[in-house]
Amino acid sequence: MNAPDRSRNPFRVLQTHRNFRLFWIGQTLSLMGSWMQTMALGWLSLQLSNSAFIVGLVASVGAIPVVLFSMHAGALVDRSDRLKVVRITQAVFLIQAAVLWLLTWQGHATIGLLLVLAFIQGIASAVEIPARQSMIILLVGREDLQPAIALNSSGFNLARIVGPAIAGLVIHRFGIAWCFGLNALSFVAVLWGLFLIRLPKVPSPFAGTRAWEVITTSTRDALAGLRHLDQPGVVRDLLSLVSVGAIFGAPFITLMPVMARDRLHLDAGGYGVLLASLGVGGLIGALMIAGPASHWTRGKVLRTTGLLFPALVIALAATTNAHVAEELLFAIGVVMIMFNALSNGVLQLRTPEEFRGRLMAFYSMVFVGLSQAVGAFAIGAVANAVGVEWAVGASALITLAFASWTFARSPELARV
């Protein structure tokens, strides 16, 4: 009786695990700054180019290194101290945001410079994301992994609410540059939390391996990881579903500046409200997974949210009413985060420790890399040719068709 009562408290993991509490607080504050930068960068790209294609291009360039290097980075993460890796890459993010602030503040920002800085950020992200994601189980243990992932998602979505709201005010009062400056400052919070974390030493099967051996064997290890993930079963089916959703479903977020301005006739403040609506929904979805929804059948929730997400994005593409768009984005946020948090947890729990870094590397390669490098680039090009509503609607329809087919042919997904 006690265990269910405890699990219904979505914040129990924060109370129980000091290391995760430090990580979560610092990460959430930093993500607020990151969402400010995301909103400001999309708006700045649109101002400098007046092109949906360029907005998609800026988003996609930062994802190219994630596609190219993620699996090698995952092999490196599996051989490394993950906490140290996260500390170093977060420091790189701080420097990148500071340079972006300085260039924009002095009026020297150009599309070319934005592309270069986005590429540098992508290189760091290729290493940081699998290290950070696979570190969560070390902070809380296997028993609390699912609620910890859900709470991590809740912090992400809390930041998506607060960050764009602050960004809208900052852009209006002080200009776009200060969004980048505040983001640079926010990385101080996450670095502070990371340096306070103390993790026990975990014996590595790669202990004693020299640095040059890590480099020369990373390709072999990356291929071994791919072979493991390609084995028939729930992991492969779920990764396929996640991949198609990330490439065709998620990139609608990249074109939100264009939809806000051209379809819904909103300014930067209105664009911030749209992103905040998505964040509020995501926060609710994450808390549902961390709390009461943890008692639902995971397979049924995966199926319901996996089908609802693209259907709601199709409805969003069709609307020209800002209030309806806000309501749809709220609903999209709920189902998108519920699906993502559940799929992330299922994948990690079904993958051995020695492959977990490479699993999360593949996950980040798809969610951050292919989603932006392929999905955002393609949807931006299509939007430039036929209109943003057709681009978003068609990509979501592809996602819906694939999800329907996958759930129909993989009944074991309903039993995870």
Task: Tell me what each language-model feature is.
Residues R6-P65, R227, Q231-L278, A373:
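Helix-loop boundary and gating motifs at the non-cytosolic
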Residues S34, I120-R132, I332-S343:
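Core transmembrane helices of Major Facilitator Superfamily
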Residues N19-F20, R82, Q133, D144-Q146, ...:
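Cytoplasm-facing, short amphipathic helices at loop-to-helix transitions on the intracellular side
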Residues I111-A118, G122, P147-F206, G270, ...:
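Hydrophobic alpha-helical transmembrane segments
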Residues G26, L151-A159, L241, F362-F367:
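Hydrophobic alpha-helical segments of secondary membrane carriers
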Residues M1-R8, F195-R227:
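Flexible cytoplasmic inter-helical loops of multi-pass small-molecule transporters
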Residues V58, V67-H72, R79, V85, ...:
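C-terminal transmembrane bundle of multi-pass solute transporters/carriers
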Residues F23, A109-L117, D237-L238, H323-L329:
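Short hydrophobic/alpha-helical segments at membrane-entry points of transmembrane helices
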